Amino acid sequence: MVGKLLAPEIKSLIDARNFNALRELFREWPPADVAEVILDLPDDEQVIIFRVLPAALAADVFEYIGIEEQQNLLRAMAHEQVVGILNEMSPDDRTALLEEMPSAAARQLIKLLTPEERRIATSLLGYPEGSVGRLMTPDFIAVHEDWTVQQVLDYVRTYGHDSETLNLVYVVDERGKLIDDVRMREFLLRPLTTKVSEIRDENFAALKVNDSQEEALNVFRKYDRVALPVVDSNGVLVGIVTSDDMLDVAEEEATEDIQKLGGLEALDEPYTTIPFLRMVKKRATWLIVLFLGEMLTATAMQGYNGEIEKAAILAMFLPLIISSGGNSGSQATTLVIRAMALGELRLRDWWRVVRKELLSGFSLGLILGTIGFFRISLWQYLHIFDYGNYHWLIALTVGAALIGVVLWGTLSGAMLPFLLRRLGLDPATSSAPFVATLVDVTGLVIYFNVALFILRGTLL
């Protein structure tokens, strides 16, 4: 917001080549605001801004810019600028950039790093894709349990400038094995002669370096920490993951789930940059599956061709019946998938969900069935449409079918995520279109069987 208000002034400073004033102005701004301003400028002026910023601030601002824009800037910057920014970036943000680049380009950028930064970069990139190791940073404060509070505070003042966070201090033994994490407030509130061993309680949570990022997100939700330590297979502290990284993971997970619920494969690139053919492939796969599934609807209708010929009026209500079942199923599957994602539901809760959705499905079906019954009766009474001599039986058929189809759709939508979870698959795969397709076919069978039962001897 600040950037938009001052955009004309910034533009004037750039045109006047008053870089000193520009530098002093940006020193007073949060890096996120500077990044917002830069993205609103033409490409050549973006490079100018980075050229006048101090190296540390330039790296901080660079980290708030999207991956695509980062790559464009690196291509436009001078060699010295690229070297300075890459070496000043925090290891986790640099890893996020490098892993999104083509292998050859990433290798060239790694060569620009100092030996120490190169060692860190190659180490983090060596962990499996999607693992905690790719998210973590080795910049943290670690102390020993025989230190005093005074020693800890002196150490933090000396080496804390490069730490990702100072909210937590990690206690390790002589081999680097994690013993505990202690909040900084504990050191600030204790006498300076107090030993670390007197403060720690060994009550801590830690991530394994090969844990998935989704598992890490669940741990963060459970313990509500700003950072969590990461240990290797021997329990040695190798890094930390902070909550800002988890926010990115949560956004990616939510995006992936939404895309799957929409009936397509999750995109692994932003919508604006994904190649056309890859977009078509990811969308076509599920569309083909759903189309083949919908073909079963035509097959099912062929089985009731005789009934449709005898009572063509039944075909009029097919869209109404089928869409109601699909909509109720989509609602149920969305609710259950989200509850699973938040940890509110586990596999063992399936029976509780069945009971709840039985009542919900019946109630919703009864509401829609009642509306359908009275709609047909009212149209007949007002002479808007003539449903024939057995109009009340047709109304009863539609009402009863709606109860059955909505109940079935609700149960199907609620149980499908549990089935997929039991099979070790992602529950989000049971997307709303998939549930709707399933209920379309089965709803058709329910509708015509209800019609056969009620209308036998009259219209059928």
What residue ranges belong to the model's regions?
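Hydrophobic packing positions in regular secondary-structure scaffolds
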Residues: 1-265
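Alpha-helical transmembrane segments in multi-pass membrane proteins
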Residues: 31, 286-294, 317, 321, ...
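Non-transmembrane, extramembrane segments of multi-pass ion/lipid transporters
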Residues: 245-281, 330-354
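Membrane-interface segments at loop-to-transmembrane junctions
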Residues: 273-282, 346-361, 392, 396, ...
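Core alpha-helical transmembrane segments of integral membrane proteins
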Residues: 274-341, 346
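Juxtamembrane/transmembrane-helix interface segments of polytopic membrane transporters
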Residues: 294, 298, 302, 368, ...
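Membrane-water interface of transmembrane alpha-helices in multipass transporters/channels
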Residues: 303-318, 384-397, 427-428, 460
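Re-entrant/interfacial helical elements at transmembrane boundaries that shape
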Residues: 330-341, 417-421, 432-433, 445, ...
